[in-house]
Swiss-Prot record:
NCBIfam families: fumC_II. Belongs to the class-II fumarase/aspartase family. Fumarase subfamily. PROSITE patterns: FUMARATE_LYASES (PS00163). Homotetramer. There are 2 substrate-binding sites: the catalytic A site, and the non-catalytic B site that may play a role in the transfer of substrate or product between the active site and the solvent. Alternatively, the B site may bind allosteric effectors. Its main location: cytoplasm. This is Fumarate hydratase class II. The keyword Repeat does not apply.
Length: 455
């Protein structure tokens, strides 16, 4: 069953069970591209924005209190996820996001009119009052992006930090051989090594918390080209204040609306911090899977949890699947960063028209990293253990312990000891005594792996 909707281009039929209008229907038909829906976080952010703008318009005497209340009630339904099925549009549409703005406007008007009566609330004249897609979409981008970071990504970073802190303490005195250039180096403790991973997360969280302040200023109030045409001079300030009350986030009105409409450097900047986190997560996951390689023919210093059979042909095989998933996510995030960077450069004159693809990739990065960090923590990190016998054997066999002799006999003599031990396949101690450069007593005194860690 269908109904007839009308816009400036004429009549068009719409599924009678759906709440969208003519412009949404035209977009749905004209942009049958891919299967990537506009992120629901953007729809919810739009609803928060439309509720705030309705309140401000009512306070300014432009919109009746009755209409503002009705608009706000529908916005609450949207935010609570009750109307998700009525937002069918894909990311691949106009670069200003106009169709999604109108999708929200039309749904709000339609649902509100079910109560107030047909035609009482107009999607453009009432719901979109004092606004343009050009300032509402970038505002929704910032609302959605900031909320996703606060509610999804930052909590997962903190939880992974806590697990690494526990592992660090547990293994702080377990001496292992260090490795630089993928070759044996001087010893450190496993706890010290893990502390480096923990610091990766701590520092990246700090980078993110600092950079995300860049998306607190909002474009709302700029309307079409940044001049604020058809909006009051302080409309942006009032809406930002109302959004702060709604969300608890310290949003402000951007001081330069021309910048806010044409540049997406704030989101580009914040995603740079997300990419940095992805880079370090790839490093951590790679370290763990290499240290867990084996179990008999690899490094084998770490043991990863057995979550599932590793091979369809090799019985008993355990693979570092969580590490692999994490590194694939990291690679995807790095790719998203390239897309965002290119798209952010396309602010031609007064408007960037790559907005949907920017926020789509941003929110995908946040979701993928949040989900993969949770999975990695629960199914890998928490069950990660040290293979202490293997670690001890590798420390005792390492030739790089000879570095501790440098202050006592000099670099060249120490190098000769290491070379002799390697050439004759003997222990470092046997080679040192054979050269006559040190006595057994001196060797035992000077070669203490734990002391070499400066713990």
């Amino acid at each position: 069953m269908e109904r007839i909707e009308r816009d400036t281009l004429g009549e068009i039929s719409v599924d009678a069970t759906k709440y969208w209008g003519a412009q949404t229907e035209r977009s749905k038909r004209n942009f049958a591209i891919g299967d990537n829906p506009m992120p629901i976080e953007i729809i919810y952010a739009f609803a928060q924005l439309k509720k705030a703008t309705a309140k401000v318009n009512a306070a300014e005497g432009k919109l009746s209190e009755e209409k503002a209340i009705a608009i706000g009630q529908v916005c609450d339904q949207i935010i609570q996820g009750e109307l998700d099925e009525h937002f069918p549009l894909v990311v691949w549409q106009t670069g200003s996001g106009t169709q999604s703005n109108m999708n929200v406007n039309e749904v709000i008007a339609h649902v509100a009119n079910l109560t107030l009566g047909e035609g009482q609330i107009h999607p453009n004249d009432d719901v979109n009052m004092s606004q343009s897609s050009n300032d509402t979409f970038p505002t929704a981008m910032h609302i959605a992006a900031y909320g996703a970071l606060v509610t999804k990504l930052l909590p997962e970073i903190t939880k992974m930090e806590a697990v690494l802190a526990e592992k660090k303490s547990k293994y702080m005195h377990l001496v292992k051989i260090g490795r630089t250039h993928l070759q044996d180096a001087t010893p450190l403790t496993l706890g010290q090594e893990i502390s480096g991973w923990e610091a990766c997360l701590t520092n990246n969280k700090n980078y993110l918390e600092t950079s995300m302040k860049a998306i607190l200023p909002l474009a709302i109030g700029g309307t079409a080209v940044g001049t604020g045409l058809n909006a009051s001079r302080d409309f942006g300030d009032k809406v930002a204040e109302e959004l702060m009350k709604q969300t608890g986030y310290p949003f402000t009105s951007d001081s330069n609306k021309y910048f806010a409409l044409t540049s997406h450097s704030p989101i580009n900047f914040v995603h740079g911090s997300i990419r940095s986190l992805a880079s370090d997560l790839m490093k951590i996951a790679n370290d763990i899977r290499l240290l867990a390689s084996g179990p008999r023919s690899g490094i084998g210093e770490l043991t990863i949890p057995v979550n599932e059979p590793g091979s369809s042909i090799m019985p008993g095989k355990v693979n570092p699947t969580q590490c692999e998933a994490m590194t694939m996510v990291a690679a995807q995030v790095m790719g998203n960063d390239v897309t965002i960077n290119v798209a952010a450069s396309q602010g031609n004159f007064e408007l960037n028209v790559y907005k949907p693809v920017i926020i789509f990739n941003f929110l995908e990065s946040v979701k993928l990293l949040s989900d993969s960090m949770r999975s990695f923590r629960l199914h890998c990190l928490e069950g990660l253990t040290a293979n202490e016998k293997v670690i001890e054997t590798k420390v005792n066999d390492s030739l790089m312990l000879v570095t501790a002799l440098n202050p006592h006999i000099g670099y060249e003599k120490a190098a000769k000891i290491a070379k002799l031990a390697f050439d004759e396949n003997t222990t470092l101690k046997e080679a040192a005594i054979k050269t006559g450069f040190v006595t057994e007593k001196q060797f035992d005194l000077w070669i203490d792996p734990l002391k070499m860690t400066n713990l």
